[in-house]
Amino acid sequence: MEDLMTSYSFTEKKRIRKDFGKQRSILEVPFLLAIQVDSYREFLQENVDPAKRTDHGLHAALKSVFPIASYSGNAALEYVGYKLGEPVFDERECRQRGMSYGAPLRVTVRLVIYDRESSTKAIKYVKEQEVYLGEIPLMTENGTFIVNGTERVIVSQLHRSPGVFFDHDRGKTHSSGKLLYSARIIPYRGSWLDFEFDPKDALFTRIDRRRKLPVSILLRALGYSNEEMLAEFFEINTFHINPDEGVQLELVPERLRGETLGFDLADGDKVIVEAGKRITARHIKQLEASGIAALAVPDDYIVGRILSHDVVDASTGELLAQANDEITDEQLQAFRKAGVDAVGTLWVNDLDRGPYLSNTLRIDPTKTQLEALVEIYRMMRPGEPPTKDAAQNLFHNLFFTFERYDLSAVGRMKFNRRVGRKETTGEAVLYDSKYFGERNDEESKRLVAAHGDSSDILDVIKVLTEIRNGRGVVDDIDHLGNRRVRSVGEMAENVFRVGLVRVERAVKERLSMAESEGLTPQELINAKPVAAAIKEFFGSSQLSQFMDQNNPLSEVTHKRRVSALGPGGLTRERAGFEVRDVHPTHYGRVCTIETPEGPNIGLINSLAVYARTNQYGFLETPYRKVVDGKVYDEVEFLSAIEENEYVIAQANALTDAKGTLTEQFVPCRFQGESLLKPPAEVHFMDVSPMQTVSIAAALVPFLEHDDANRALMGANMQRQAVPTLRAQKPLVGTGIERAVARDSGVTVNARRGGEIVQIDAARIVVKVNEEEIVGATDAGVDIYNLVKYTRSNQNTCINQRPLVQVGDVIARGDVLADGPSTDIGELALGQNMLIAFMPWNGYNFEDSILLSERVVEEDRYTTIHIEELTCVARDTKLGPEEISADIPNVSEQALNRLDESGVVYIGAEVRAGDIMVGKVTPKGESQLTPEEKLLRAIFGEKASDVKDSSLRVPPGMDGTVIDVQVFTRDGIEKDKRARQIEESEIKRVKKDFDDQFRILEAAIYMRLRSQIVGKVVNGGAGLKKGDVITDAFLDGLKKADWFALRMKDEDASEAIERAQKQIQAHEKEFERRFADKRGKITAGDDLAPGVLKMVKVFLAVKRRIQPGDKMAGRHGNKGVVSNVVPVEDMPYMASGETVDIVLNPLGVPSRMNIGQILEVHLGWAAKGLGRKIQAMMEAQAAVADLRKFLDDIYNHDDTNVANRVDLSQFSDEELLRLARNLTDGVPMATPVFDGATEAEIKRMLELADLPSSGQTQLYDGRTGEAFDRHTTVGYMHYLKLNHLVDDKMHARSTGPYSLVTQQPLGGKAQFGGQRFGEMEVWALEAYGAAYTLQEMLTVKSDDVQGRNQMYKNIVDGEHEMVAGMPESFNVLVKEIRSLAINMELEDN
């Protein structure tokens, strides 16, 4: 028993979830961002000793491209190693300045120049040098990249694994519906090679999907003759020709199966098969038993059979017949005449030995290897004149050289497995013993020595003909054994290699010059192509996405996403149903629930909770070992290919206390089917019930009671929840909340254990435990700076709040501070609301939601959004734009929020249309009248030559300015505001460093004190020899004088010396860091070309919940707020408590998401238990009673050993703190597929003194009358989604117009109008509202003259309109004229 008890950390002791899971946890939830972090770590191999780096990532890419030799071969550039420098700016600075977070890559290369004169290639001279190859983006510890100041995520790609695949066309190609089989060799990079049958059973090949050629052309190009091809693919029957008549067949009985002979088959006198009868398996057994070796057959038996070899007249050398000819009567007579003794024929039949290659040879026009090579050249390069060399080089470069073709380790492994070879390693190119055997370069000799007489291409064709012959099966391309995951590291490596290959071409050109001109490696290598390739990938690849940062869950999910789209993947339009569908191999690897609705459904998936990738990139999932019906805790990860061979039981299979499977038949999965098997046949068992789903789906309680479509919506909508002002843990969770919050990186976790010594809103200081301190310079202090009110990618607010107090003792990994949407280290996306399921005056018709005013008053769903507004001053043709408070034609009142530099104050409350940054732009001189010129000469009025282009608050937005940043171009004088900001920033940094130094110093002195108090001195600091140091003496001594003490004890004097060194080292380090920071702050900023100054203003916008906002539960039960009703009108219970939200009960039955009802029941029980605990606390019950009640809640069910809570670990003080944290409700965990049962929910309700039906009598708040029947009431975790009505409301009177049609633009972003479409026109036509219609189609839309005239008329007070010609009609006329049809308008 005891070993099951977990010890609780400091954070967990604050609040413990009651867990209903029956399954003991075998495997902890793994680090959720591992797929990103591990992949990129392997790519960089940053902290690995250069000599020990493996063939991955940067190292592999550099090794594959270098050495680069010049065309003459007299100079070469070799790769030695690489190292990454330090990033110039840290993550925070990059975000602020809009930079990319990366480190410079420096590669050491060696230029070797050989002596031309010597025959042995003697080295003339060698130069080694470090070359800068651009910036490599670095990954933050949360798995993201910062590109141009924004956080991005590189999504992993699920693509078809390299290797060989066999398939058929499902009868679609030919009208007869005949299945045409095909094979395709897909390399990691290089040309695809296809083999396919046509309806006439000839075999063709295609290279890169071009036009098809008979497959024999490819084999002939490899060097095979007709006879060799036939010998490879067919077994041969030998016939001996009798001189007069008849033929003797060398009998292999098996080969006669299915034939019908025209003569009796006899063994002596005993007839085995009568003439005209079909030969069966029984007959063959008899023949084998009889031991007949030869069979005499008539001539007509051999006629029509296909020759396997050329037949030559031995005496004259005349060719009598060629291989692959069908034997005719005449030829047979000629053989007899020439005295040919024996001929070989191909063993073919219609059943399972098709004559496919023989058919193909008949349509092959080529005769020699050269002709075949030329044919391939013509197909690949139509229109170019072929030469022998060109044809040979082209063919060689297609499949046989590593520069152009790479199967990769995965591809080779898959290839060898599919064609039935034992070994999984081999060459990256296609190997063919005949082809390489005829070449005599070094590489070919090495290959032949290594692989002997195998042939990749022949093996594929053999497997394909076997499949066509009915032996073997085609592959399922949606099987996860045939699709692999390409993660960040691998994609970055490919991009880096592409950049290097571009560099290689340029280097080759220059190397020939290097010999004569003595160039250095730095002059040879131009890093631009590499840097450009990397920048393009991280900045604009389809898989480099703007991180979804609504809340911690959406961040984690985005990083765990697996997409089938992207370069080298599928496209939405072409992806069929099969690719998108759930496949049995998805089990435990890819979530079967979470995928977007819409055009991407099934193409974008999410990794399952426990899934990981193996070394080849295939997804694997963990299973527990089962041996002879006994389940062990040993865990093994299986890929989809390996899993195929095993029988796997479900996680909830019944076992006894010893772990033996108890049922007679266990429900299992085997090869994609579900069946029942006896325990002895089971090999593995699932690790956990939530193995099949992703994190988002695993966060939905009672998922097992929801319909899959709704569960999908629930999982997707949790990612859109906006972090509320105060996060609230879900009363009903699934127990995985803590893991998600921990791995998302939004909380602050302790790096090392220790004691909290100082804390404020922005910083936590930990004095580290002695045993965790490493190294002499480590002062044993950890300082955590918290993130305060910063903007996320989705404009939500990121803010961290400390959870600990001074004096708390914490361990490594404890949560020190909560981030957005976390509550004591648990994910908390919404609020627990009291919900009633009942109709309420139609206000909850069609999923509408009725809210109580109390929800708004208590700010339960108030969220803070941070908007970033940017004002840019550019250099224009007419002169520079200027940021200033001196703006023409603007009232004083409009400028009252600006300082003298023209920038808004921090703390100003602004509304739509207010000026935030004053800016004027010079405008072109208009022609002035002499009077104006005179006036301007007299009054010197300058206002007329600039126009106001200030940054104003956009419509529909109001808020408080929380931060202003001013960026100034290098070499331009900073204005007063910029200098102010700079000074305050330097002050802040200085104070920060001073504080940090003070804390470190105090910690060092404190450690020193413990090491020297009570020790004897030799003198110094006013002490005599033999005195003992006391605490009181040290208190009276200046800190600097401590180091003057001379100790008797060796250790103590060493401690003093060490402390002094530490303080000096830290002081130096802080000075250096401060100087570095200061330099960065005061330096000019790197702005885009033409930009002189940039001001960023950050607005905090408070959004309360209001009608029109979208809300949802976790079960796909979404809706829009329809009304906010005063508290006194809401339904209330007998106790007087009013409900917060009223939902429509009709939303449940048809949608089949019953999970929400169970959640409401259990939530109510959780809240009731909290109230009982509160009542006990208020009554000051004895701690023992409280302990007993908590034990009753957590450990009532003795059978559920898996999740007992050991309350004996808690001291009385800790228990009281736990109880205080539970007064708001006892949080419950019901893990997916292993959740609370109906009986358990009822027991909890009873324990909380609530009706076990989960229903209660409600009263109408307006009349006070009781409703007719009892209502389901309880607590549900309800979310506010990031679809807020404030972001969608939009109106326009005048605004921008489209350039060509002159019609108003559309959409809020463009400040567009509302489209008056076809159907709306019909509606006005139907009403006969001709004038309204004319106005809509002309002056309100695209009649330019009419628009302007209308404007003038309104200004003049005349309300009349003159409709003219709509511009779009003019466009139509012009388009018709462009088709050379003249169309003119006549006045009627």
UniProtKB/Swiss-Prot annotation:
NCBIfam families: PRK00405.1, rpoB
Keyword field: DNA-directed RNA polymerase, Nucleotidyltransferase, Transcription, Transferase
GO biological process: DNA-templated transcription
Gene3D superfamilies in alphabetical order: 2.40.50.100, 2.40.50.150, 3.90.1100.10, 6.10.140.1670, DNA-directed RNA polymerase, subunit 2, domain 6 (2.40.270.10), RNA polymerase alpha subunit dimerisation domain (3.90.1800.10), RNA polymerase Rpb2, domain 2 (3.90.1110.10)
EC main group: transferase
Complex and partners: The RNAP catalytic core consists of 2 alpha, 1 beta, 1 beta' and 1 omega subunit. When a sigma factor is associated with the core the holoenzyme is formed, which can initiate transcription.
GO molecular function per UniProt: DNA binding; DNA-directed RNA polymerase activity; ribonucleoside binding
Function: DNA-dependent RNA polymerase catalyzes the transcription of DNA into RNA using the four ribonucleoside triphosphates as substrates.
Organism: Stenotrophomonas maltophilia (strain K279a)
Protein family (similarity comment): Belongs to the RNA polymerase beta chain family.
Gene field: rpoB
Catalysed transformations (reactions): RNA(n) + a ribonucleoside 5'-triphosphate = RNA(n+1) + diphosphate
EC numbers: 2.7.7.6
Descriptive protein name: DNA-directed RNA polymerase subunit beta
Top-level taxon: Bacteria
GO CC aspect terms: DNA-directed RNA polymerase complex
Pfam families: RNA_pol_Rpb2_1, RNA_pol_Rpb2_2, RNA_pol_Rpb2_3, RNA_pol_Rpb2_45, RNA_pol_Rpb2_6, RNA_pol_Rpb2_7
